[in-house]
Swiss-Prot record:
Cofactor stoichiometry and binding remark: Binds 1 Mg(2+) ion per subunit. Binds 1 thiamine pyrophosphate per subunit.
Native organism: Shouchella clausii (strain KSM-K16)
InterPro entries: Dxylulose-5-P_synthase (IPR005477), THDP-binding (IPR029061), Transketo_C/PFOR_II (IPR009014), Transketolase-like_Pyr-bd (IPR005475), Transketolase_BS (IPR020826), Transketolase_C (IPR033248), Transketolase_CS (IPR049557)
Function of the protein: Catalyzes the acyloin condensation reaction between C atoms 2 and 3 of pyruvate and glyceraldehyde 3-phosphate to yield 1-deoxy-D-xylulose-5-phosphate (DXP).
Protein name as it appears in the record: 1-deoxy-D-xylulose-5-phosphate synthase
Length: 628
């Protein structure tokens, strides 16, 4: 079938299972080919092809609401809702979003990117449906990894209590990004072997209803019998105790079984959970054999061999992080690492190879990870909480209440700080400076290169005056020479990278090389600009700021973070409190959510380019010269 001719899923209504199986094969071939060029979340999508086909055949989207938790498994849904022609632009600038997007299609009723939100969203939609008196089905599709998130468990508890009719499809592939951890994962493991329970329960009801005269009445009061059967055959039916009707486990690649159970779920009153077992990466051998999560999401790859297409370059910041942490941990047994389900992305899997008892993957539990780090710190340990900037948002109260308020020595290693590119607006790491710098006791640092980064990590672990956050980007380092030994850096003291007398740039991190290119252009035009590495975002270098004000230099702050409440705002606040008058402009991320694209394209969009920096400075300098 030509998938690019699909307009909407209505054509599936009359498809036989044989036709659906042929379509599933076409979809898998399409995804493997297209994603080899663009990259993307191939593993999750290959695993849900039959499930997505069954859902769209049995339900009437967009009247019936399909909510895809996290959303990285929604590519098949996008194909069936008319977006196959756009797959050449997947995750590219102004192209097809890698997650559900309400402005992209009426079939995308719930936007995602972070995990564990679909059940709460579904509960809200089901409540609105009942208040309005309509009858649409609400279906949330959530993975076994996302189900371990605290918000999902909160929603399960409320849904079970309210007994709203909605369907939860648990897509259980035994992996999220990395292999799942925790007690709930163990419960699901037991349920995977409990198919006999569902069959026995259905058979029991059928037998009871066949009893002359009394059968119907007995069937209506058979819950205690079924409960006894449940405890006889399955150790702890977690979901039924939460108030759900549990159906499964179902083979997620068996269309007959899938359609039977989903049809039963539609007819069942109250909340229903359909437990579907899928194979992540199904149909593509390299992805099927992945045991570490490497094929969860990828860049481009060679379709025939599965070999990843990698550009040579310096080590990545996460690799420098893990290797430096190992060096320090060899000398200090108090150093421990905590990650919320991102051991591979953060490279803490490298740390765990050497120190398996000192690395803790707590699952999708950013709040717990933050407070566990605080608890470790109270006992004299040196916890390093490694978390993506975008996911640190999910544990903000714990950073405030448990870490900063108690002034505990926790190092928060903020990975993916700044614009991350293809994952788009749900993953851009541009808010952490704004939401952290208002907190008492915290120190915020940001290195300009990988060499400064290793010294900064050492400084952070040695620091014993409270919490310290170190921000660093996703990509490769700059290729600078790495010092052999580690040393402590002064906190709250900036350094001048380039002297100048016409104006000064205050910036840090990834914006240093961008500013250097701007200064090269300005130098050719006859301007002499000072460049300052403001690597201590909090505290500021107050002595240097006072000296700059006394020189009456025009100042330009540049940051790869939001302007509102950011570094530039901190500099303005300082001068306001001191009553000092300076000519200052700020450059950074404007007040909107930045969508997907390459980082260089996004720099162009938000104005963080050498040309825009040079133009901004030139617009300031004539005013300065005129006053002189």
């Amino acid at each position: 079938m030509n998938l690019e001719e699909i307009q909407d899923p209505s054509f599936l209504k009359n498809y036989s299972n044989k036709q659906l199986e042929e379509l599933a094969a076409d979809i898998r071939r399409f995804l493997i080919e297209k994603l080899s060029a663009t990259g993307g979340h191939i593993g999750p999508n290959l695993g849900v092809v039959e499930l997505t086909l069954a859902l769209h055949q049995l339900f009437d989207s967009p009247k019936d609401k399909l909510l895809w938790d996290v959303g990285h498994q929604a590519y098949v849904h996008k194909i069936l809702t008319g977006r196959a022609p756009q797959f050449d632009t997947l995750r590219q600038y102004k192209g097809l979003c890698g997650f559900p997007k309400r402005t992209e299609s009426e079939h995308d009723v719930w936007e995602t990117g972070h995990s564990s939100t679909s059940l709460s969203g579904a509960m809200g939609m089901a409540t609105a449906r009942d208040l309005k008196g309509t009858n649409e089905n609400i279906v949330a599709i959530i993975g076994d990894g996302a189900l371990t998130g605290g918000m999902a468990l909160e929603a399960l508890n409320h849904i079970g209590h309210e007994q709203k009719h909605l369907i939860v499809v648990l897509n259980d592939n035994e992996m999220s990004i990395a292999p799942n951890v925790g007690a709930l994962h163990s419960i699901l493991g037991r349920l995977r072997t409990a198919g006999k329970y569902q069959k026995a329960k259905e058979d029991l009801e059928t037998i009871i209803r066949k009893i002359p005269a009394f059968g119907g009445k007995l069937a209506d009061t058979a819950e205690r019998l079924k409960d006894s059967l449940k405890y006889l055959m399955v150790s702890g039916m977690f979901f039924e105790e939460m108030g759900f009707t549990y159906l499964g486990p179902v083979d997620g690649h068996d269309l007959d079984d899938l359609k039977h159970q989903l049809s039963y779920a539609k007819k069942t009153s109250g909340p229903v959970l359909v437990h579907v077992l899928t194979k992540k990466g199904k149909g593509y051998k390299p992805a099927e054999e992945d045991a570490t999560g490497a094929w969860h999401g990828t860049g481009p790859y060679k379709m025939e061999s599965g070999e990843m297409v990698k550009k040579p370059g310096p080590p990545s910041y996460p690799s420098v992080f893990a290797n430096t942490l190992k060096r320090i941990a060899r000398e200090d047994e108090r150093v421990v690492a905590i990650t919320p389900a991102m051991p591979g992305g953060s490279k803490l899997d490298l740390f765990a190879e050497e120190f398996p008892d000192r690395m803790f993957d707590v699952g999708i539990a950013e709040q717990h990870a933050a407070t566990m780090s605080a608890g470790l710190a109270t006992q004299g340990m040196k916890p390093v909480y490694a978390v993506y900037s975008t996911f640190l948002q999910r544990g903000y109260d714990q950073v405030v209440h448990d870490i900063c308020r108690q002034n505990l020595n926790v190092l928060i290693a903020i990975d993916r700080a700044g614009l991350v590119g293809a994952d788009g607006e749900t993953h851009q790491g541009v808010f952490d400076i704004a939401f952290l710098r208002s907190l008492p006791n915290i120190t915020i640092l940001n290195p300009k290169d990988e060499n400064e980064f290793q010294h900064m990590l050492y400084t952070g672990i040695c620091y014993d005056d409270g919490p310290i956050a170190i921000r660093y980007p996703r990509g490769n380092g700059t290729g600078v020479k790495m010092d052999a030994s580690l040393s402590r850096l002064p906190i709250g003291k900036w350094n001048v990278l380039q002297e100048g007398t016409d104006a000064a740039i205050l910036t840090f991190g990834t914006m240093i090389p961008v500013a250097e290119k701007a200064l090269a252009q300005l130098k050719q035009a006859g301007y002499n600009i000072r460049l300052i590495n403001a690597n201590s975002v909090k505290p500021l270098d107050e002595k240097l700021l006072e000296a700059l004000a006394e020189e009456e230099l025009p100042l330009l702050t540049i940051e790869e973070s939001v302007l509102q409440g950011g570094f530039g705002s901190a500099v303005l606040e300082f001068y306001n409190e001191k009553g000092m008058h300076v000519e200052l402009k700020r450059m950074g991320i404007p007040d909107y959510f930045v969508e997907h694209g390459s980082v260089s394209e996004l720099y162009q969009e938000v104005g963080l380019t050498p040309e825009r920096i040079a133009d901004t400075l030139i617009s300031m300098l004539p005013q300065k010269r005129k006053r002189a």
